C-alpha cells in the first residue's frame, strides 16, 4: 500500500466516524424533542443556537479551515432544525389573516427556527406574473388574481412541512379553504385595526386599502371578513403585544394539542 492509499484509507476512517456521530446526533435531537414534549418545556429555544455558535467559535480560534468547519456545522444545525420540524409537523402550516396581521413576520421566524420552506403567495404570484399585486388587479382584475391564488394552493398539495403565507383575501373563497385543509393546518393571526394600520401605512402594494388607510375603514373590512376567517381557522392567535417567539411558541403548542386529539 503506497502513501496515497494509506491517506485515503485514513480519510475513509474519518468519514466513518463522522457518519456514526451524525446518526447519533440526529437521534439525540429527536430525544431532546421528546423530552421537551413529555415535560412541557418550551420547544423553541433560539438562545441554544447562539451558545453552539459561540462554542464553535472558541474551539476553532486560531485553527486552519475555520470557515469550512463553520459551514459544515451550519449545515448540521439546519438539518437538526428540519428533523425537529418533521417531528412536529407532517403537514403544511397555512397562515391566514388580514394584511399586516404578521403572516410574513411569523413565516420568516418559523423558517429561521425550523429551516422550513416558506411560500409567500403574493410574492410568488407577483414574481410569476412579472408585476406587482396592484398592477395585476389593475390590469386583469381581482377575479384573475383570485384564480392564481387557488391554482397556487392546489400546487402546494404536492408538498409538506412548508409554511404558506396567504394573502388577506385568500380565505374568502371556500374552494381555497378546502385546498388549505387537504394537507395543512390553518392558523389565523389577528390584530387590532390600529395595529394593522401602523404596520401597513407605509406599504403601497395593498390595493384594497391604498386610498383608505384609516382605522374605521380597516375595522369595517376586517369585520366583513371575520366570519370566514374564523370558519377557516383551525386555531386563532392574537398577535397584539407579543413578540415573534411568543407567537410561534403558542402556535407550536396549540398545534401539538390539536394533533393529540
Locate predicted features:
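ATP-binding Walker
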Residues: 101
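Walker A/P-loop
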Residues: 104
Amino acid at each position: 500500500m503506497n502513501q496515497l492509499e494509506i491517506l485515503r484509507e485514513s480519510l475513509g476512517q474519518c468519514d466513518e466516524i463522522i457518519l456514526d456521530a451524525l446518526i447519533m446526533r440526529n437521534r439525540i435531537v429527536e430525544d431532546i424533542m421528546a423530552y421537551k414534549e413529555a415535560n412541557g418545556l418550551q420547544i423553541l429555544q433560539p438562545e441554544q443556537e447562539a451558545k453552539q455558535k459561540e462554542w464553535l467559535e472558541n474551539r476553532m480560534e486560531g485553527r486552519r479551515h475555520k470557515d469550512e468547519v463553520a459551514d459544515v456545522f451550519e449545515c448540521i444545525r439546519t438539518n437538526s432544525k428540519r428533523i425537529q420540524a418533521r417531528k412536529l409537523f407532517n403537514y403544511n402550516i397555512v397562515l391566514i389573516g388580514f394584511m399586516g396581521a404578521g403572516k410574513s413576520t411569523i413565516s420568516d421566524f418559523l423558517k429561521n427556527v425550523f429551516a422550513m420552506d416558506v411560500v409567500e403567495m403574493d410574492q410568488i404570484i407577483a414574481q410569476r406574473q412579472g408585476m406587482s399585486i396592484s398592477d395585476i388587479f389593475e390590469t386583469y382584475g381581482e377575479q384573475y388574481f383570485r384564480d392564481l391564488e387557488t391554482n397556487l394552493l392546489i400546487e402546494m398539495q404536492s408538498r409538506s412541512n412548508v409554511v404558506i403565507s396567504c394573502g388577506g383575501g385568500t380565505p374568502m373563497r371556500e374552494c381555497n379553504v378546502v385546498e388549505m385543509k387537504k394537507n395543512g393546518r390553518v392558523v389565523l393571526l389577528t390584530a387590532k385595526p390600529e395595529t394593522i394600520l401602523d404596520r401597513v401605512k407605509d406599504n403601497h402594494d395593498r390595493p384594497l386599502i391604498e386610498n383608505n388607510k384609516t382605522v374605521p375603514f380597516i375595522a369595517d373590512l376586517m369585520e366583513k371578513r371575520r366570519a370566514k376567517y374564523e370558519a377557516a381557522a383551525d386555531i386563532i392567535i392574537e398577535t397584539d403585544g407579543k413578540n415573534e417567539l411568543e407567537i410561534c411558541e403558542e402556535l407550536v403548542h396549540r398545534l401539538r394539542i390539536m394533533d393529540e386529539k
